[in-house]
Amino acid sequence: MVYSYTEKKRIRKDFGKRPQVLDIPYLLSIQLDSFQKFIEQDPEGQYGLEAAFRSVFPIQSYSGNSELQYVSYRLGEPVFDVKECQIRGVTYSAPLRVKLRLVIYEREAPEGTVKDIKEQEVYMGEIPLMTDNGTFVINGTERVIVSQLHRSPGVFFDSDKGKTHSSGKVLYNARIIPYRGSWLDFEFDPKDNLFVRIDRRRKLPATIILRALNYTTEQILDLFFEKVVFEIRDNKLQMELVPERLRGETASFDIEANGKVYVEKGRRITARHIRQLEKDDIKHIEVPVEYIAGKVASKDYIDEATGELICPANMELSLDLLAKLSQSGHKRIETLFTNDLDHGPYISETVRVDPTNDRLSALVEIYRMMRPGEPPTREAAESLFENLFFSEDRYDLSAVGRMKFNRSLLRDEIEGSGILSKDDIIEVMKKLIDIRNGKGEVDDIDHLGNRRIRSVGEMAENQFRVGLVRVERAVKERLSLGDLDTLMPQDMINAKPISAAVKEFFGSSQLSQFMDQNNPLSEITHKRRISALGPGGLTRERAGFEVRDVHPTHYGRVCPIETPEGPNIGLINSLSVYAQTNEYGFLETPYRKVTDGVVTDEIHYLSAIEEGNYVIAQANSNLDENGHFVEDLVTCRSKGESSLFSRDQVDYMDVSTQQVVSVGASLIPFLEHDDANRALMGANMQRQAVPTLRADKPLVGTGMERAVAVDSGVTAVAKRGGTVQYVDASRIVIKVNEDEMYPGEAGIDIYNLTKYTRSNQNTCINQMPCVSLGEPIERGDVLADGPSTDLGELALGQNMRVAFMPWNGYNFEDSILVSERVVQEDRFTTIHIQELACVSRDTKLGPEEITADIPNVGEAALSKLDESGIVYIGAEVTGGDILVGKVTPKGETQLTPEEKLLRAIFGEKASDVKDSSLRVPNGVSGTVIDVQVFTRDGVEKDKRALEIEEMQLKQAKKDLSEELQILEAGLFSRIYAVLVAGGVEADKLDKLPRDRWLELGLTDEEKQNQLEQLAEQYDELKHEFEKKLEAKRRKITQGDDLAPGVLKIVKVYLAVKRRIQPGDKMAGRHGNKGVISKINPIEDMPHDANGTPVDIVLNPLGVPSRMNIGQILETHLGMAAKGIGDKINAMLKQQQEVAKLREFIQRAYDLGADVRQKVDLNTFSDEEVLRLAENLRKGMPIATPVFDGAKEAEIKELLQLGDLPTSGQITLFDGRTGEQFERPVTVGYMYMLKLNHLVDDKMHARSTGSYSLVTQQPLGGKAQFGGQRFGEMEVWALEAYGAAYTLQEMLTVKSDDVNGRTKMYKNIVDGNHQMEPGMPESFNVLLKEIRSLGINIELEDE
């Protein structure tokens, strides 16, 4: 493998055996591709905005004299970039401009004569844009649109599994689900009649819909039944014989023909009998006359002479009827063929219960069901039925729906109309009847072939279409109002409904979620989340067990591990690592093609439907070097079951062992040794890890760390190769390689880094460069680390030296004992940034004012404010300190004469304002790191705002001019090269000032042209600089667009440093979570023979019952990795020669049987080897991929190489007494995370505070500054003790006895420590509730 210069800094030893056939795909593509499809101009008009416009336009007036046509659209440039939007609290969006054409036709002239055409570009609101990382900035906060897993449109056949009716009879049903429009359900009732429902309303006999489609009873019977023909010859009854139909029947008479008896009466008719009848070519047999009684006529029989209807279709025949028919000359009688086994008489029975008999009555019946209470007219009934399923405006199956529909009915073509046809409805009924007759299977609705993914683009398009449809109505009205000659397209279109629909979706849809920004992994997982909830999806309460369960088709598509615990379990899933969606929105997963028993590197993506037809081998099947399977029998999956197949039956093979799991689960080493429940907790808890002050790469990883760190977008990644020309904390400049430059550019890439910004979860986002000056860079190298990344690898926690042993009960019930050293070294110290805002509004009594002149506040409280009343940057503040001084005018109060006199003497006027300053919340303390002031247009800016503005302008100018200098330097170096090549002496150039170089002329024409080109670029560069500076200046100095009534907003950012402390929650990656019980002095911690103390002591009882053995293997492997690091460290300290180092590190990389990773240190220079060794001092990082990890033997080999005991256990000594512990203890290195459940955020105390309005009881929760609930069980406890007075106090004066509370206060002030409990307020509430039920209840005074 070839490593770039940056990758050589630290190479993770990989224990994976299976070759990596397919690279891990870009992890955010599900979001970015979907939105790209929405925004991109699509010439076919299949997707996105184009599809929405084409489906609504052209809009015609009611009269048809004019229409508004759509031509094209374009998206403008966003006003602010992403960072500016976040600071200002606005939406990152682009204006949508649509070119429309208004066509007016001549009224009197023939059809289609155009009178006038007007074309115009119309503004249609703002469309929020997706950032490069797959998020949206809505009102200044980053949000993610979660993809939805919903039932695919199409037709589904299902049964109630015998649960509806008490008899346990299985009732079958079919449901046609369109993408938009009414649902159509067919269902059997317990009497086997077929019914239809539209939109889950009242059910009607299914034949009504056929009559509404203009079928007569005869035609209906003709569609669904085969015929049995009887003929009357010589007063005998002959039946046309179709031998197949007799199979399984019992003969009710002798079956004979040509004097030969084929079946005797009472015998079962078998296949042998049928073969004989067919062989002798028997076409007719004679039947007794009684046999026809009970058969059903298949058509109307009319007496030719009188025209009287003797026997209508679907009537049961009797002997009398037969005689009548015979008399009127009907010798040939057709009846319906039915039997109890596989040709049920369902439709015939349904026709009998059908009250209608022609098209009109059927339409009226449907109208009554859909619009109860409205008087039906013929036109209304016809148009309602037409619009239900046969109008493109109201009904659309969509391409997916049509494809699923046709596949389900086994048709050949998969494309077709989006509306239903007569044939569609009839075929669905036929298939449903076939299933009832025992032919065919019902569908599995949890199969991923029947559920599809709706991503951002599609949902945004649907919302946009909703907005357009609202506009359409208004446009139709306007077009019909007349006076079109003066109107232009923009007078027709009101953009409000469109932007309202889009805004509503992005702002408040259930699937538009506040991004989880705890760490890079939580961001990526949130964007790859798949929810079954949301509009058009399931609800938590209704979702049963089956929907939530893992389905065989989830394999490689949806992760079976990562899902929340609690009410949403199984409804919210995560996309597997390699999964992607196909054009129809179904999930696909990649497989390697197997041809003639040889596994190729050809990759095919299969959806769940296609996968069912193949035999698929697992990724860990053993192959020889030619790609043949080694074993004769291979474990494979086929049709959702796993079993053994011979090697020549195999069609495909899994791509990778990680293919089953999601990104979160693929980061857990030794996942294969953990119980699934704990793995689920581990995957979920990694997302809650808080980024530590100094990120520390995991010693034991899975090799996915780099992919997650790079794809999450928190790191700065090189777009093009080159060398590092300049680097400081906030900017990296790369001089691009010649071969990667675009013609005619300066060849400089500038990366500006994010410094100390607040994330959605109040954690700190900060990027730090990890490259040095002059280093060569390749495309895709990581240039700067973000939060929780270390040298371009995800680093959520810290490597801790752990021991599994009890320690004085401090690790009882999963508690964690931590060494003081962890606190001293700031291993788990995190920075949290809080944003506090102060809003100055315009009130009825006058504007609020931000000022340092606050009434009744001492000097000390104002010491941290400047003259504008805003806190200084760098001030250390604690709870209750004033951050922004603000006063609000209050109404004039009536003053007493004395007060008036004092006022007159002292000129006091301070009492007409009250203090409404922004203060630091209780329990919070930190340092002010930034202040921002937003002022409304037209409001005078205060001194502080102007200072900030000045500073921003200076900074912007400095940034831009530095950028210009860098680009200029790059350009001039190229000019220099051209001039020297053109024959100008270097000495002469060095003496001339740079800007005079461009005036020199060259004799060589080609070189002169190049020089002129470069001169043009130089002018353009300067012009661009001026333009950019002006734009920046305008943005900084212009007023801000604030909400109505708001004059000023001051935002103060506090940085809080949180050290680890007892009560904080920590966890490993295997679901092993616990709370810190004690921080122990270093000298008391258990230590080994060398005196190295452990950092963390964990309870060994947490392992066996939880069955997460992965943590033990991780501990052993971590120990080995550290041991090798220690040996490298010792060699570096002794300054041994590079050859020895190279040899030892090479041994470590080569260890392990047939591993796929090949590291050849001979290709490294000495300097590179030394730098690699420097980075391996703290331990050699190791990758053990999921399901393909290090074996026990390999861990032992690695331990041996590090001179450590292969048991993984060492003798420890008690730090307090120095005595040796009784038996060896498992000690090693485990990766521990600090979770975002910090005791500081949860600790809370109250003595008095706010009370609930109705019950007058204290509120609950920290946010409301509430009390602790003394609940039912606590009351029982006091009752059991007999502590009557304590109980009385709890339930009255300490809770909701309003008078008692105030009396108590007075008593305490007076020094009288007694209480007088009264009536609790909640008792009055109870009385009122009883009275509201109409029961009078009165309390009698004694």
Curated annotation (Swiss-Prot):
Q: Any one Gene Ontology biological process term?
A: DNA-templated transcription
Matches recorded under Pfam families = RNA_pol_Rpb2_1 (PF04563), RNA_pol_Rpb2_2 (PF04561), RNA_pol_Rpb2_3 (PF04565), RNA_pol_Rpb2_45 (PF10385), RNA_pol_Rpb2_6 (PF00562), RNA_pol_Rpb2_7 (PF04560)
In the UniProt record, which is one GO cellular component term? DNA-directed RNA polymerase complex
**Which keywords does UniProt give here?**
DNA-directed RNA polymerase, Nucleotidyltransferase, Transcription, Transferase
Q: List the disulfide bonds.
A: none
Q: What is its EC number?
A: 2.7.7.6
Domain of life, per UniProt, equals Bacteria
Kind of enzyme, top EC level?
Answer: transferase
SUPFAM superfamilies reported in the protein's UniProt record? beta and beta-prime subunits of DNA dependent RNA-polymerase
Task: List the molecular function annotations (GO) for this entry.
Answer: DNA binding; DNA-directed RNA polymerase activity; ribonucleoside binding
Q: Which reaction does it catalyse?
A: RNA(n) + a ribonucleoside 5'-triphosphate = RNA(n+1) + diphosphate
User: Which InterPro entries does this UniProt record tie to the protein?
Assistant: DNA-dir_RNA_pol_bsu_ext_1_sf (IPR042107), DNA-dir_RNA_pol_bsu_external_1 (IPR019462), DNA-dir_RNA_pol_su2 (IPR015712), DNA-dir_RNAP_su2_dom (IPR007120), DNA-dir_RNAP_su2_hyb_sf (IPR037033), RNA_pol_bsu_bac (IPR010243), RNA_pol_bsu_CS (IPR007121), RNA_pol_bsu_protrusion (IPR007644)
The signal peptide here is: none
Its quaternary organisation is:
The RNAP catalytic core consists of 2 alpha, 1 beta, 1 beta' and 1 omega subunit. When a sigma factor is associated with the core the holoenzyme is formed, which can initiate transcription.
Assigned protein family = Belongs to the RNA polymerase beta chain family.
Matching entries from HAMAP family are given as: RNApol_bact_RpoB
Protein name, please?
Answer: DNA-directed RNA polymerase subunit beta
